[in-house]
């Protein structure tokens, strides 16, 4: 091994901790030694990096997100530190498979879907680009949940990831802080002015753990700060002795619940209350700590916005606005006007959805007793904002823009009012925000809104997930694209080169064979690697329309079985988690499994189509599926998907997009042109028009033989004793996301996919063009826009 120092560290750790040598150590011992050695190396780099930042005193960004879906860290760190090849060879010389060591590491249970993965991509990209940034979130003990499929139904179990995942974390006991809930607020006038005192509160200790973020071949090391909740005082013997049994352990109960699970079900008041506690807990801890550090360095907070950029990633961290106000007012003695000026110059907000149910609202009745001081500040912000709107002569907007309205606290409105910048995450999404969702706000703040299209960290999604493709591209066009993905456009000149196109398809076949093996081992289903791998992998939600995909599969089943269709063989691959309280999403998972079962039991049909549902979708599983995909299903109803990033990862790996003109699909379409993408369905204005005139799904049933035959078949379809008439009833009476309106167009697009796939040369060229034009979807480009246009931060030299 070239890096002798790194090798010696691993061997010393094994000897010191376990009394073993590298050739006699267990895989678990080798894993622990490797994780700990990397953590130590990153800590040393971090120290040097922080010393440089202390000299420059430059502005830093703080990215606040309820989730960070980081994926496994071990391979990512070895790749970024340029150690992977060395360690692989060193381990091989000692009879150890590095890939087997990788497989020991669990995915950290810190995120769920696209929001968390985007946050992690941005931390990676910012670090690789030498920008100073810290992420803030919660150290969830059990993650979101481990998904197990039992008889086609999703079941949720705790995800015990910390036992093996803890080796990458650094505990910072010097930076613990107190977070307060409940109690009452007393206001009084003193010699020093107006004072507010929070009394009879429940105190929770926030304990910090740092996950160090490496950059690609750089000395920059940033931090993801994760807070764990602990009871500050523990069991209260005095209260217990006085018969107040539940109150005696109240703090312990609150603390243990806060950092247990990501996104507890919010169908009850208890669940809603827990979500509020989680959000305030990590926001309060984070802002308290960074203000303390800033004040210790500068002796004032008046220059906070010159050195600190706070970012609200979706509405979950929106309480940062009143919390910063609380600290400035109550702890540091600033006037309201001065505190508000500092706050609004410090915060920026990214909106990630136009879905009404995802624009968080909390009832005053629930919120006020839980966070009395924060509520009083929100109330004052709302009062002053409403008066300002009236003074502008725009009082007609208040029904839409007021922060507190109809006894609800609207967190998106709080984020907009309290931030100096608001951005959407794709061109279409940002247009919808200013033209529709936040139209009234745009009228009030015409210069506040902008767009930053999402991006992905290609070093993980190509370099690590698909090393075969990455290595070939490096040989073909050079390795510039690893640092700067825009350079991948050099591949375009090979679009007509048969040898290159064939080689790319050979690599795709290798990845499909690898995935086929995994599918066989995981589900017992044998799939044909020469079939079209048609992939839809994302959170299960009605607007993402996994149901439309399933309807098409049932349509194909009928055509093959009864009408003599003999299509190009196709493997439909799904992976998705449904929120634990989302019954319709769970029903769709069951429906997909039942279709798979129906097909597997039919000797004729199973030769042509297969349906695979891979359980427990997470980053590591995505890294297996995405490089093997031929078709990328991005079929949300137009106007509903803010951006998406799975579409970008699949495009980069040569999958062809089958999608609506929604989210970032619009920009993928612009990048590759009409001939290298399969577009179908209604566009956003047509969806809006149909909604205005009243969408009637029955009309599509009556006018389309394909729809009628498919739905009639589903009504009679019974698999494992279960009938799916309720799916048909839902589609004919609600069809909230217009599956039937887009069905005929979708089937036609799928027929074009099948026809095109038979022309291997053309398909290969289309695949190449998608990879070659993925450069604009690099997270490096996205974070550059945030750094320059929103946060005003500079690279560390």
Label for each model-derived stretch:
Residues 1-797:
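A conserved ligand/cofactor-binding region detector
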């Amino acid at each position: 091994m070239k890096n002798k120092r790194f090798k010696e560290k691993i061997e010393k750790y094994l000897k010191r901790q376990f009394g073993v040598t590298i050739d006699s150590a267990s895989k678990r011992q080798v894993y622990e030694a490797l994780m700990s050695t990397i953590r130590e190396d990153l800590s040393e780099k971090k120290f040097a990096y922080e010393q440089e930042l202390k000299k420059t005193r430059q502005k830093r960004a703080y990215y606040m997100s309820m989730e960070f879906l980081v994926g496994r860290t071990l391979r990512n760190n070895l790749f970024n530190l340029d150690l992977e090849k060395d360690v692989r060879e060193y381990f091989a010389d000692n009879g150890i498979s590095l890939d087997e060591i990788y497989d020991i590491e669990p995915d950290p249970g810190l995120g769920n879907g696209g929001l968390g993965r985007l946050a992690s991509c941005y931390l990676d990209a910012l670090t690789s680009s030498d920008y100073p940034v810290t992420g803030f979130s919660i150290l969830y003990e059990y993650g979101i949940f481990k998904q197990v499929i039992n008889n086609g139904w999703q079941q949720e179990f705790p995800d015990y990831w910390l036992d093996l995942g803890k080796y990458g974390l650094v505990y910072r006991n010097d930076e613990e802080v107190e977070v307060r809930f409940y109690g009452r607020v007393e206001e009084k006038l003193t010699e020093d002015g107006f004072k507010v005192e929070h009394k009879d509160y429940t105190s929770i200790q926030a304990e910090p753990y740092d996950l160090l973020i490496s950059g690609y071949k750089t000395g920059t090391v940033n931090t993801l700060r994760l807070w764990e909740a602990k009871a500050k005082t523990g069991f209260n013997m005095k209260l217990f002795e006085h018969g107040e049994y539940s109150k005696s352990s109240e703090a312990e109960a609150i603390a243990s619940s806060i950092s247990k699970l990501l996104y507890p079900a919010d169908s009850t008041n208890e669940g809603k209350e827990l979500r509020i506690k989680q959000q305030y807990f990590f926001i309060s801890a984070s802002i308290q700590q960074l203000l303390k550090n800033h004040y210790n360095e500068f002796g004032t907070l008046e220059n906070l916005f010159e050195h600190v950029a706070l970012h609200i990633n979706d509405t979950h961290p929106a309480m940062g606005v009143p919390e910063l106000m609380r600290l400035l007012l109550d702890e540091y003695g600033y006037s309201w006007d001065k505190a508000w000026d500092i706050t609004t110059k410090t915060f920026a907000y990214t909106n990630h959805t136009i879905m009404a149910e995802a624009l968080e609202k909390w009832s005053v009745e629930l919120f006020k007793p839980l966070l009395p001081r924060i509520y009083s500040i929100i109330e004052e912000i709302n009062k002053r904002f409403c008066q300002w709107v009236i003074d502008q002569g725009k009082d007609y907007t208040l029904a839409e823009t007021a922060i507190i309205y109809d006894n609800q606290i609207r967190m998106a409105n709080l984020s907009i009012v309290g931030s100096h910048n608001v951005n959407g995450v794709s061109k279409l999404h940002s247009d919808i925000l200013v033209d529709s969702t936040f139209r009234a706000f745009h009228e009030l703040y015409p210069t506040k809104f902008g767009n930053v299209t999402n991006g992905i960290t290609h070093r993980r999604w190509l370099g690590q997930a698909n090393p075969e493709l990455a290595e070939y591209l490096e040989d073909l066009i050079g390795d510039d694209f690893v640092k700067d993905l825009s350079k991948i456009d050099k591949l375009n000149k090979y679009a007509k080169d048969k040898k290159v196109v064939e080689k790319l398809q050979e690599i795709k076949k290798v990845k499909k064979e690898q995935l086929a093996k995994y599918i066989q081992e995981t589900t017992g289903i044998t799939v044909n690697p020469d079939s079209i791998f048609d992939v839809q992998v994302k959170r299960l939600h009605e607007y993402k329309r996994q149901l439309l995909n399933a309807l098409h599969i049932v349509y194909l089943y009928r055509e093959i079985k009864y009408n003599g269709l003999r299509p190009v063989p196709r493997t439909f691959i799904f992976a998705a988690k449904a929120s634990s309280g989302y019954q319709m999403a769970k029903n769709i998972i069951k429906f997909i499994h039942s279709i798979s079962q129906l097909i597997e039991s039919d000797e004729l049909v199973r030769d042509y189509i297969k349906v695979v549902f891979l359980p427990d979708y997470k980053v590591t599983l995505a890294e297996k599926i995405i490089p093997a995909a031929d078709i990328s299903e991005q079929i949300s109803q137009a106007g509903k998907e803010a951006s998406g990033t799975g579409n970008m990862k699949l495009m980069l790996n040569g999958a062809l997009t089958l999608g609506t003109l929604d989210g970032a699909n619009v920009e993928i379409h612009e990048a590759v042109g009409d001939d290298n993408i399969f577009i179908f369905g209604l566009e956003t204005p047509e969806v809006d028009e149909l909604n205005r005139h009243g969408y009637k799904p029955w009309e599509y049933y009556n006018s389309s033989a394909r729809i009628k035959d498919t739905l009639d078949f589903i009504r009679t379809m019974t698999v494992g004793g279960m009938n799916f008439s309720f799916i048909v009833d839902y589609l004919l009476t609600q069809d909230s996301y217009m599956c039937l309106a887009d069905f005929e167009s979708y089937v036609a697009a799928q027929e074009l996919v099948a026809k095109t796939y038979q022309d291997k040369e053309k398909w290969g060229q289309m695949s190449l063009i998608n990879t070659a034009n993925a450069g604009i979807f690099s997270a490096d480009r996205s974070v550059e826009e945030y750094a320059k246009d929103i946060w005003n931060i500079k690279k560390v030299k």
